[in-house]
Amino acid sequence: MLVVFVATWSDLGLCKKRPKPGGWNTGGSRYPGQGSPGGNRYPPQGGGGWGQPHGGGWGQPHGGGWGQPHGGGWGQPHGGGWGQGGGTHNQWHKPSKPKTSMKHMAGAAAAGAVVGGLGGYMLGSAMSRPLIHFGNDYEDRYYRENMYRYPNQVYYRPVDQYSNQNNFVHDCVNITIKQHTVTTTTKGENFTETDVKMMERVVEQMCITQYEKESQAYYQRGSSMVLFSSPPVILLISFLIFLIVG
């Protein structure tokens, strides 16, 4: 009985050691592409499948499919299709630059800049047209209906060129109405006496506002100059510069 058990156990051990023919990872069919030269490999070499270096499928460097560098399909650098180096439509059409209109140029001009051809006058920033009552319903209604035709910016010179507010406002009103009238008349629109009367009132209010704004800025600049020109401040600044440089 013991001899039979030993013989059976030895026979089972020899069966496990014997190589099995065929099957995965044997000499017949291997993955990926290993084993005998005649086996079936994936990916196959020298064939014509997808992604191969010498085939004719999609994306191959020497094939003729879409997107290949030497093919003839769309978007290829040496092909003859649309957008290719050898094609007739190899560049996008560049859009023409938009023309800059006078309206855009005027809108881009900074408020307070010196206006050329007006002898040193500056153009103030845009304002909301004031609500003015003229004493009767007709003129009040006329103003509300036509206020968009009147100026919303004024021309002025620096406040330090005038001795008082009245002179500033008088000059501001005259030059603003003159410029606005000339510009509007050139466009083929005329003003009536009522228009001129209302423009004088509107522009006068805006010129007063502009004077107050410019006067405040002028005095602030003057105060800053006086502050920094005082001897204690100059001494302090000099000491700080000495500490930084030294």
Curated annotation (Swiss-Prot):
Bias (Gly residues) ranges: 45-88
Topology in the lipid bilayer: Lipid-anchor; GPI-anchor
UniProt key word Signal: yes
Signal peptide start and end residues: 1-15
Family matches, as InterPro entries: Prion, Prion/Doppel_b-ribbon_dom_sf, Prion/Doppel_prot_b-ribbon_dom, Prion_copper_b_octapeptide, Prion_N
Sequence ranges of the Sequence repeats: 44-52, 53-60, 61-68, 69-76, 77-84
Disulfide pattern: C172-C207
Localization per Swiss-Prot or TrEMBL: Cell membrane; Golgi apparatus
Binding locations of Cu(2+) 2: H62, G63, G64
Removed propeptide positions: 224-246
Residues with lipidation of kind GPI-anchor amidated serine: S223
Record GO terms (molecular function): copper ion binding
Residues given in the record as Cu(2+) 3 binding sites: H70, G71, G72
Xref: SUPFAM superfamilies: Prion-like
Keywords: Amyloid, Cell membrane, Copper, Disulfide bond, Glycoprotein, Golgi apparatus, GPI-anchor, Lipoprotein, Membrane, Metal-binding, Prion, Repeat, Signal, Zinc
Positions of the UniProt region annotated as Disordered: 18-100
Main location: membrane
Glycosylation sites: N174, N190
Stated name of the protein: Major prion protein
Organism: Erythrocebus patas
